[in-house]
């Protein structure tokens, strides 16, 4: 069994937030190391069902071994797919409604810690960053083939990098001489593009650029938005969605979508009764996001930026 070590963040809070019914049908959109799936399974009866998605075959294979007995009993079903295909994949299995859906977003620890995957600026590795290894677009393609304007846009939008233009300009200059093949090369040229004073504060100088490229390679925000829209429609009455985010762009997207779904639309003044078609179908369970305890952050530093938001279908 291939190792897939990952400390699950906000484990109990996210699963408890789903208000699990023992005979219910649930979806874990981000299987990873199986932490959330395992806790959901422990709360299900023999009639309960869990459908666990991951686009990384390493995670699927690891969990097929880990949950071999539950898999044979049909309690857990593994789906190798991007969670943007949630409706299509569940429809194939004649699942038209579910009681809860969980998302634990971002890159899992094994993906970060496996140097060959090219997610981390701490290792020198081929520029890859694909969550789905069968996908054709890689970080190398983005860095070497995308235009200066495209690079500036993703560095600003997905990395919130204020030195986006100088980094993109440096990339453009270097790649005209020789292809940029590795994370180490990319880190070096990012450092060259950022003023020395700025490099000394605010964490690793390549962090924001690497985040931006990773989001672009995997279309993470597009996939999340599409998936959440479908997930909200899939919920049975009383069903809930728990979403754990790790960076501000994801959290903002979830916050805005949940607010829209739980707010009344603008109506003409003086209407005596709100029409049924205009009534709110969802309610927020978390007015403010749930964040990890100091103790959890002490034991798992990667938890420090996590935020959990929960919504329920009425």
From Swiss-Prot:
InterPro entries: RsmH, SAM-dep_MeTrfase_MraW_recog, SAM-dependent_MTases_sf. It catalyses: cytidine(1402) in 16S rRNA + S-adenosyl-L-methionine = N(4)-methylcytidine(1402) in 16S rRNA + S-adenosyl-L-homocysteine + H(+). S-adenosyl-L-methionine binds at residues 34-36, 54, 83, 104, 111. This is Ribosomal RNA small subunit methyltransferase H. Disulfide bonds: none annotated. It is found in: Cytoplasm. GO terms for biological process: rRNA base methylation. Specifically methylates the N4 position of cytidine in position 1402 (C1402) of 16S rRNA. Its main location: cytoplasm. Keywords: Cytoplasm, Methyltransferase, rRNA processing, S-adenosyl-L-methionine, Transferase. GO terms for molecular function: rRNA (cytosine-N4-)-methyltransferase activity. It comes from Ligilactobacillus salivarius (strain UCC118). Its EC number is 2.1.1.199. The keyword Transferase applies. Belongs to the methyltransferase superfamily. RsmH family. One of its GO terms (cellular component) is cytoplasm. It is an enzyme of class 2 (transferase).
């Amino acid at each position: 069994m291939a190792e897939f070590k990952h400390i699950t963040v906000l484990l109990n809070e996210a699963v408890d937030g789903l208000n699990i019914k023992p005979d219910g049908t649930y979806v874990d959109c981000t299987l990873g190391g199986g932490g959330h799936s395992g806790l959901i399974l422990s709360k299900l009866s023999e009639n309960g069902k869990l459908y666990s998605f991951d686009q990384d075959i390493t995670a699927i294979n690891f969990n097929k071994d880990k949950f071999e007995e539950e898999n044979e009993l049909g309690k857990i079903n593994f789906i190798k797919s991007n969670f943007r295909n949630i409706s299509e994949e569940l429809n194939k299995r004649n699942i038209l409604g579910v009681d809860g859906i969980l998302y634990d977003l971002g890159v899992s620890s094994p993906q970060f810690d496996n140097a060959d995957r090219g997610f981390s600026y701490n290792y020198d590795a081929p520029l890859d960053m694909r969550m789905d290894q069968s996908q054709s677009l890689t970080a190398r393609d983005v860095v070497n083939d995308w235009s200066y304007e495209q690079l500036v846009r993703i560095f600003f939008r997905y990395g919130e990098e204020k030195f986006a233009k100088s980094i993109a300009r440096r990339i453009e200059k270097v790649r005209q001489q020789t292809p940029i093949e590795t994370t180490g090369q990319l880190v070096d040229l990012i450092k060259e593009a950022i003023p020395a004073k700025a490099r000394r504060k605010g964490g690793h100088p390549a962090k924001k650029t690497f985040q931006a490229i990773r989001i672009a390679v995997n279309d993470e925000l597009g996939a999340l938005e599409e998936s959440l829209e479908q997930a909200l429609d899939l919920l049975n009455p009383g069903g809930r969605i728990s979403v754990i985010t790790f960076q501000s762009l994801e959290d903002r997207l979830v916050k805005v979508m949940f607010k829209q779904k739980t707010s009344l639309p603008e109506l003409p003044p003086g209407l005596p009764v709100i029409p049924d078609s205009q009534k709110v179908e969802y309610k927020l369970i978390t007015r403010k996001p749930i964040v990890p305890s100091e103790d959890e952050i002490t034991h798992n530093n990667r938890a420090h930026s996590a935020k959990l938001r929960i919504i329920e279908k009425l």
